[in-house]
Amino acid sequence: HFLPDAKRAISLIIRDNNSYLESDFAFAHKAHVQTYMMQSGAYDIIRELERYGYDSITNCNWGNTPKEYHFPDAKIAEIIRPRDDSSKYIVHTVITNANLPITGLKLAKKIQTPSRKPEELLKIIKSRLLEFECNIIGVAPAKRLKDIADQIRNHYENETEFIVKDKAKRFYDFDPEITRKQRKIYSAEDHLPNARSVIVIGLKIPSETINITSKTPAEAIGPYAFVQYEIQVRLFILAWCVKQILEDHGFKSAISYDVNGVGSYVGNPRGEQPDIFSNAIAAVAAGLGRLGKCGFAINPIFKANLRFIAVITDSPLPTNKVLTSDDMHLLCEECSHDRVECPTNAFNDEINFSIDGVVSQFRKIEVNRCNWAKRYSLSAEEGNKYMGWELDLPVPENITENKLAEGVKKHPTISKYRPCNFERCFLKCPYSG
């Protein structure tokens, strides 16, 4: 049905273990990027086959192809998965007329890489990440993240976050479904039992993308919205590489977009993306920066222009020291941009915590006030006015489910599915751009 003279099927396989704390976003985003990686690998195979004069095709289960003609990738995944393995197996197939040797459906037993000293393993990880143009890498002991969680937990766990989903189809009026999420603060062990180390990976947002956002003459916001999405794709690919290296050496691992859980999300045309506060504390714990007053990490070289992902592992890797004021002096004490620029007045009192004797301070954010703007597009100043929306609702003193529902019902019917938002506190920060 796919290639008239087909002779062989080449199946690419991903084996995946779910994290103990996988959010809806993490689950969906992981599946999306894994598909992206499989497709990229499939196209590389096709290009090589075509170099030698063979025809090939992939993506046989996409588009309007009737299901009875789908290639049985899911069936192959069932066959190759060992009975005693609870992991998820994902298969993506290339069909070709090249008469390649047949390997069969039984996977060869994975050869365990000899154990290495922690210093050698970290060197391998860093070398691999640098091949993918990773900007910055740090490691924190899992205990640091637990100590921080214990210090800040009381400031968050009495707070309820409202989660809004649109039940309506595209191009229909917004039909809100609101659920309550009790905020929780996590440690590395919540993501992976017996966690020993947390590897934090950072990628830089291009400075000019930040500098042009919402500024005249173009008042462009699209480039920043694209970076919000694309940087998360690249971060996951980097984290996946680290995960494979660790597991090749016999260690367990889990990927997290926000280890401690202090962050939230920002509205984006390609689905909500982790905001600038996600994994900021993990980055500080890994020695990659100091925590600014607004609650995001500031690095001596890349300033606040970084986004982070974390890999939690039971490998006892060498760790970074925490940066002090001697390493980097922040201007936050003299700055009032956080409260002046926030359109929803989301910043509250300061929270302090100590890591290895180094004190960090930041203002706690009232999550529903912050989400009113950057996540749910109800404040013009955090993005929607630059997309032509005429929606700017003053934030209520007390945000309730009903008030939030009434607000999102005012989303424009046609363009509601393409929100382009940003964190105004970040764009106005002297350390951005």
What are these model-derived regions, one by one?
Residues 1-30, 113-222, 227:
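Non-catalytic, usually N-terminal nucleic-acid engagement modules in DNA/RNA processing proteins
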